[in-house]
């Protein structure tokens, strides 16, 4: 296992340089057998950080360019006697027993590692039948543990309160950047998580496209679209939700469209139950919008979410996913529509699947502001 997200998911440990660089040469987690302890290759400079943090992990460090020394070496001016080994050298040592026996299966995150790394793997392990295990992690991460559910409750609380605070500053003359700064400041003030770097807000025609916040000034006829979240830094968990608001003089067509999207999204959430097919959930929302907007097109109406780095993960709510909804999944249920040059919407909430249906986690921030017109 080479990705920092999945190393953390399995061990609770976060290799620093692997996380910063996303270079698989910095660390690897080896799982030989379910009855054996996992082995983590670490930098010599970081090994002490992980000691005693997880008794189920064996640490095996490699020498780096850092030049780490102990006190005796400094006092006695001892020449270094390094056994220079890389992370991959250590992995090779631990897997040599399999190479000696002939053909065997070797699971590896092919979706994460680089082309040069995989070529090196093939050279070092010529008898290995490489199997991509990337999807196994995404599927495992789709159903949350009780501890993970609480993590998401905390994260959504922080993001929701931040957006609620931001909503109080919506007024004519405010800039996109300034409004987003309110959201970020609230999260920083709380201190538990960080605002997701990709978080965006757009006014008017900017609400219909993927863009960074600008100096655009809010006018009384604008649509407003927020899309963002928070993340748990080196614990990796991330969130994703959206709000779309309309200023008092917004075009009546925008008012009508928002109501259509909102009602469809709310109906989807109310219909969620354990055992329901994702394709059925998609069709429910999609067909409801289509009744009023016959040319509505959309590839999916939501997704799972966990440790990232991407926010949209399996299972996706689309017409082709016939897998079923499971208890303790956390889903982002969204019904967007973007109209180029006119305005855009994304009605999105984070929900927890319960044995009785769905609990909306992002319930604190409003879908409608007090001054908004309703159909």
Language-model regions, residue ranges each:
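Active-site neighborhoods and metal-handling regions in enzymes and metal-associated proteins
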Residues: 1-375
């Amino acid at each position: 296992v080479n990705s920092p997200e999945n190393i953390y998911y399995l061990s609770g440990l976060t290799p620093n340089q692997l996380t910063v660089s996303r270079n698989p040469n910095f660390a690897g987690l080896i799982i030989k057998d379910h009855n054996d302890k996992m082995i983590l290759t670490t930098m010599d400079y970081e090994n002490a950080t992980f000691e005693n943090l997880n008794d189920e992990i064996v640490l095996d460090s490699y020498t780096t360019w850092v030049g780490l020394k102990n006190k005796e070496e400094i006092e006695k001016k001892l020449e270094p006697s390094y056994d220079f080994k890389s992370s991959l050298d250590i992995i090779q040592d631990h897997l040599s027993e399999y190479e000696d026996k002939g053909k065997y299966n070797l699971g590896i995150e092919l979706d994460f590692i680089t082309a040069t790394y995989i070529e090196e793997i093939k050279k070092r392990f010529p008898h290995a039948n490489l199997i991509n295990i990337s999807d196994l992690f995404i599927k495992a991460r789709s159903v949350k543990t009780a501890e993970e559910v609480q993590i998401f409750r905390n994260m959504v609380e922080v993001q929701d309160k931040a957006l609620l605070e931001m909503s109080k500053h919506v007024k004519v003359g405010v800039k996109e950047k300034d409004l987003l700064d309110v959201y970020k400041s609230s999260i920083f003030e709380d201190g538990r998580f960080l605002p997701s770097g990709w978080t965006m807000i757009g006014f008017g025609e900017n609400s219909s496209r993927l863009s960074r916040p600008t100096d655009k000034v809010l006018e009384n006829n604008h649509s407003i679209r927020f899309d963002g979240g928070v993340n748990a830094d080196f614990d990796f968990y991330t969130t994703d939700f959206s709000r779309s608001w309309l200023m008092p003089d917004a075009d009546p067509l925008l008012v009508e469209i928002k109501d259509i999207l909102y009602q469809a999204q709310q109906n989807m959430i109310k219909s969620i139950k354990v055992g329901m097919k994702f394709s059925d959930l998609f069709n429910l929302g999609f067909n409801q919008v289509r009744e009023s907007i016959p040319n509505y097109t959309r590839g999916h109406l939501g997704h799972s979410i966990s440790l990232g780095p991407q926010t949209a993960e399996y299972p996706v709510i689309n017409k082709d996913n016939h897998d079923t909804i499971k208890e303790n999944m956390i889903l982002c249920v969204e019904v967007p529509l973007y109209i180029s040059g006119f305005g855009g919407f994304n009605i999105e909430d984070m929900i927890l699947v319960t044995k009785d249906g769905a609990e909306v986690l992002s319930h604190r921030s409003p879908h409608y502001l007090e001054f908004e017109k309703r159909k």
